[in-house]
Amino acid sequence: MTERPVTTILTAAAIRPGYQPGQKPFRHIVISGGKVVALTHTAAEATRAARGSSARRVDLGPACIGPGLIDTHIHALQAAADVRLAALRGARTIGDVLAAVRAAGFGRPADRWTVTGRNWHESQLREGRLPTRAELDALGLPGPVMVRRGSHLAVLDSRAAARLETAEDRPLTDDALIAKALALAGPPTVQERREDLATVLGRLAALGLTSIREAGVDAAELDLFRALRDQGRLPLRCDLLWRVAEGSDPDSAREQIAAMPRPGPADDPYLRLTGVKAFVDGRIADAAIDGAGPEAFRLTPGELWPIVTEALRRSGGIGCHAVGDRAVRMVLDAYQRALAAGLARDPGRLVIEHALDCAPPTIRRLAASGVSVSAHPGIVYEFADDVRRHWGAGRAARAAPLRDLLAAGVRVAAGSDGDVPPSAPLRVIWFMVTREGRSGGPIGAGQSVPRDVAFDLYTRRAASLLGVVTPRGVLEPGADADLVAFAADPLYGPADELPGLEIMLTLVGGRPVHDPAGLMKGADSG
């Protein structure tokens, strides 16, 4: 005999099917079988919609319920790799950095490395610089020390430099040497990596996220997600992109794409491999903006084309990292060529990742093409000073040009690019509204968007970019019951309260994945 699914009726001060301010909120939402059954204004209507079943009833009082948030470009794996390392995210001075390193390394044996996490940047420090080797040596720790900043930069103390047989007294930028140092430090076990990923995904659920698009995995990393899914421990719905390593030559890129497992069912509710990730240009300091040299490009147009064709044949989807306008144009050329050749039916499966620098003619081309843009304004928030310094005032004024993209009709959704920019969606939404950088005051104020539009970029538009089968990013009958309960209505109140707005409850498929107060455990039946 098939067991009937549990029906739950949630009651709150306001339940929003979407984040449009003109909609009259509901008071009750009925959930069964992981789907939304009904939204009603009265308790009697909710009881009727539950069809007489013995429903669990949860009253969330003054809470506001809305669709769960979706991050279309995140690096949960990078955050997971930092879980066991010295955290520098909260450091504000060189002294803070050194104190964190000292605390992490104190008492360790001489053969144990002290390694910091990557998710910080020297611009957050009052001194605006990295620690020096001399400062690390002065800590007097018995074992080697490596202070990482991002994935491609590290500072070594003298013991670590000796282990690597490098005498250069400057920040290390050689990826191979950084990888060697990490190997010497001792990589975590597969079990530890799996647990660390589960920890990070749980933290993301606590931020109100219900779906993510992980921007690059290899075979071993895919297995981590699969193991959590098979154990029933994935708290979020996860779309994954298969990563072509940055700087790969064409032959290597083709080999990596050929090694990609065939995507599974498009309607897998929790884990999908949806495309290939490739790199076309650099980051803020070396993006392919107008005037940049050829070194800004990781690929030539001739090298990009076979990657696009092989990716579409293998998976039907692709996301290309393109920060500068020239890189965006190169990717768009390849995408339009692929569409003309019939290699893709839905242009929305062809995604440009970042698109932080887009000139008006490029924006018009994007709109006409129908391709998608995963936009990451949090990068501009986090690195506002770098954007101004490397791009100049004019280009900085239109960095992450969300207002222009939306006005032109571009298929655009939001993502964080966390874990170095903030993964917290409410922080990114606040920045989209205020355009106040982490430092240096406003940046790109002319590209601000209204609060409801910012939420739409993290919900309905994000679900459209994912191309999911079941409705998501909205709360309506038949949609996935992915929702978040805020302590207050996020569409109203001072904008500066948004980043700290309490997330009371996060449900994915009607299942609580963040419930610190045990609200769902106290549900009444009847």
Give the location of each predicted region.
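Anion (oxyanion) recognition and catalysis
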Residues: 205, 267, 312, 367, ...
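Short, charged, surface-exposed secondary-structure boundary motifs
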Residues: 248-252, 383-387, 446, 516-518
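His/Asp/Glu-enriched, well-ordered alpha-helical/loop segment
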Residues: 195, 309-319, 323-350, 354-355, ...
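Non-cysteine beta-strand/loop elements that form the S-adenosyl-L-methionine
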Residues: 75, 268-284, 371-381
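Divalent metal-binding segments
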Residues: 3-12, 16-17, 21-255, 274, ...
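Short, Lys/Arg- and Gly-enriched loop/turn segments at beta-strand edges
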Residues: 490-497
